[in-house]
Regions:
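Iron-sulfur-associated redox domains of electron-transfer enzymes in respiratory
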Residues: 64-374
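Iron-sulfur cluster-binding cysteine motifs and their immediate structural context
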Residues: 2-16, 20-44, 49, 53-68, ...
Length: 374
């Protein structure tokens, strides 16, 4: 897959009128991408990795993540909500994934597709790559686009350590469109895929086409923009549709540690929070983690459950509570690992053949050295 030729697009934006020049963002930025000029913050685009740390620490809400509006749904004949695993964590007293997915259909979507399904396919492929000794160790997960760009900006010598697999988001978007074409008979262009996103970095990955010339995702909608509307509908649904097909470890990708557990690597570590990630990358660069097989690195505190595109309450993110909701889903789901999931097995039977096959390489693998990360 070849990289795109257009300039790198950033989702993190600054409202200069709201900025008070307090320097909170400058102090916390992990790549020194912020300066204070004439009493206002300025974002240096060539350094910004869209991790959302500045959004998290700004007391004046001057930093925002640019996403799309639900009004975009009207541009398509058939609309699919591509649901990130972290979305389930928003509803602390609801561990029924089917209920949440059914409610999305009442917001104007015609179908739903769980990114956790794609995550489990990537987990299975990762396990085979690790077992076959085909990865430079320690292998670093490619799931977090903020971490991938961080490596490109600050640790370019580690790019070859990034696992050369597509993101679950892009893989799931492709599968969702394929299934919709078969179901509706519509042309692919008339089907809209909308990612319900927990963070700024994934919006950037879509708009910049990090992995490919053009993302399979047509629009990115922040979780906080649909949360209240959807929460109001949950209590009015008596019979949820059986829509969830993901195993619980696919859903647990939203927690720090879930992806690493799914990899089944014997020597693995999980790190979350961008400053902690930097420390681990420095350790890898200094060859202090040579005995580790696999590193799951997530920019947001607590993992995607702590992403900056999610609802806030009283100024504090509820990453821990969201994570506990995801753990509860894990405990209640009898299907955990990829090899136990019928939808993952069907995907391999129908499209990928078997792990590490020629067909799997063609559809699941990528060359991370050619990604558009700068």
């Amino acid at each position: 897959m070849e990289p795109i030729a257009q300039p790198y697009w950033h989702s993190v934006t600054l409202d200069r009128d709201a900025c008070r020049g307090c320097t909170n963002c400058l102090k916390q930025c992990p790549t020194q991408a912020i300066r204070i000029q004439s009493g206002k913050a300025k974002i240096l685009k060539e350094r910004c990795i869209d991790c959302g740390e500045c959004i998290r620490v700004c007391p004046y809400h001057a930093k925002q993540a640019a996403t799309d509006s639900l009004s975009m749904l009207s541009d398509y004949d058939f609309r699919i909500a591509l649901v990130a695993p972290a979305f389930y964590g928003q509803f602390s007293k609801t561990e029924d994934c089917d209920l949440i997915l059914t409610a999305l259909l009442q917001l104007g979507f015609d179908d739903v597709f769980e990114v956790a399904r794609g995550a489990q396919e990537i987990s299975l492929e990762t396990r085979r790559l690790l077992a076959g000794g085909e990865l430079m160790k320690p292998a670093i997960s490619s799931a977090c686009p903020a971490v991938s760009r961080l490596i490109a900006v600050r640790f370019p010598n580690l790019i070859h350590h990034i696992v050369p697999l597509r993101s679950p988001m892009e893989l799931s978007a492709e599968a969702a469109r394929r299934e919709a074409v078969q179901k509706t008979g519509l042309s692919p262009q008339r089907i809209g895929i909308f990612f319900i996103s927990p963070c700024a970095a994934k919006a950037t990955a879509v708009k910049s086409g990090t992995e490919t010339k053009k993302s399979q995702v047509d629009g990115v909608i922040a979780m906080k923009d649909v949360y209240l509307r959807l929460a109001q509908k949950l209590s009015h649904i008596d019979r949820p549709l059986p829509l969830s097909k993901a195993g619980s470890l696919g859903t647990r990708w939203a927690n720090s540690g879930g992806e690493a557990e799914g990899s089944k690597a014997a020597r693995r570590i999980s790190v979350d929070g961008i400053h902690n990630v930097i420390q681990v990358l420095e350790d890898i660069e200094d060859d202090r983690l040579s005995d580790i097989e696999y590193v799951e690195a997530l920019a947001c505190p607590g993992g995607c459950a702590g992403g900056g595109g999610q609802p806030f309450q009283e100024g504090m993110e509820l990453a821990g509570e969201r994570g506990e909701t995801l753990y509860e889903i894990d405990r209640n789901n009898p299907v955990r690992f990829s090899h136990e999931n019928a939808s993952v097995q069907k995907a391999y039977d129908d499209f990928f053949d078997k792990p590490l096959s020629h067909r799997a390489h063609e559809l699941l693998h990528t060359d991370q050295t050619k990604w558009s990360l700068r």
